[in-house]
Amino acid sequence: KHNLTNNWGIGYGISYRYAKDYDFQTYDNVSGNIKPENTEAGLNEQTTGFYFSLNKNWATGTSFSISATGEYYTIGNYHKWAVYPQASLTYLKGPQHIFQLSLSTDKSYPGYWDMQSSVTYLNGYSELQGTPGLRPMTNYNLNGTYILKQKYIFGLFYTHTSDYFAQTPYQATDRLALIYKNTNWNYMRMIGANVILPLSMGNWYDARLTLVGMQARQKCDRFFDVPFDRKKWLFIGTLDNSFKVGKNLSFELIGNIQTPFIQGTLDLASSFNLTAGMKWNFAKDRCSLTARCSDISNSSMPDMKVRFKEQYLDMDSGAYTRTVSLNFTYRFGGYKKQKVKGVD
C-alpha cells in the first residue's frame, strides 16, 4: 500500500495458493444388508489472485474506498475467472447524522471431503453422499446504514449468493433411504431491513433492541427430481437487558425469537432463546462470581419437517441445548503485568 498526496491511497498485490488433498474411506466388519464400497480420491486446487485498491479521506470525516480482486480458480476439472469488487462510502453530515454505503463480495469453499464420491452410512436408513464437482459459492452484499446520534442504527441490506450450497435431506424414490447431500443451488437471495435501538433508565438499566425483517428466495433447478423455487419472510427480535444492583452486583437477561423459515425443501419452525446471568464482585473487587444459564426453555433448536411435493419427513433431533455455567475468579493483589523488551 502507498499513501499519496491529499489523503489519497492505493494498494495492489498478487497471490498464489496451491493445495493438494487425498481422502480415502474403508469399511471393515460390515453387518446387515448394506454393501459399502471402499473409496479413495485426490484433488489439486490452485488459486491465483490480483488485487488493486484506491481510497480517499477528507478532513470532514467523509471517506470512500474501492477495490477489486481478479481471481483464476481451478480444482479438478473446474476452472473459473472471476472479479470480486469491494466499495464503501461514509458520509458525515455532522456528528448526529452518519450515512454508510458498502458493497462487498466474498467466496465460500466446500470441504474437500464434501467433493468426493464417497457414501457414508449413518444407519440402516440414512446416508451421507459426497458431491463431485461441488462449486464454491459467491456472495454479494449491498448494505446501507444510517446512524442517528451515534447510537440509533437503521439499515437496509440485499444479499445474493450464486452457487449456494447446503446439505438438504432427500427421500429416495427407488429405495427406502434418506440421503443427505450438498448441492449447488441456482442462488439464495435475501432482502430486508434491520434496526438497533439502545435503551436506558438512569444508571441501573441498559438494554439494546435488535429487529430484523427480511424475505428470502431459494432456487435450485437440479435438486434430484424435486426442483424448488421458494420464498419466505423471516423476522428476528432480540432484547439484551442489563440490570445493575449497586456497585458490585449486576444481572443480564437476553431474549431472542425467530419466526419460521426455510432451507431448501425443509421447513424450520419458530425458535426462542432465553438466557439469564449474574455477576457479583466482592472482596474489594479481587473476587468475582459469575453464573449463567443459556437457553432456559431449551427451545433454540427449531423442529424441522419436509412437506414438499412427494417428500414427507419429520425431523426431531432431540437436541439438548440448555447449558449452565458457574465461574469464580480471584485476582491476586499487587500483581502487575511484566513488560517484555523487544528484540534488538
Residue ranges: model-predicted function:
Residues 1-2, 46, 50-56, 87-91, ...:
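Residues on the lipid-exposed face of transmembrane beta-strands in outer-membrane beta-barrel proteins
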Residues 107-156, 160-162, 178-193, 197-200, ...:
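Outer-membrane beta-barrel signature, preferentially recognizing the C-terminal barrel domain
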Residues 216-218, 237-281, 287, 297-298, ...:
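C-terminal beta-barrel architecture of Gram-negative outer-membrane proteins
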Residues 282-344:
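C-terminal beta-signal and adjacent terminal beta-strands/loops
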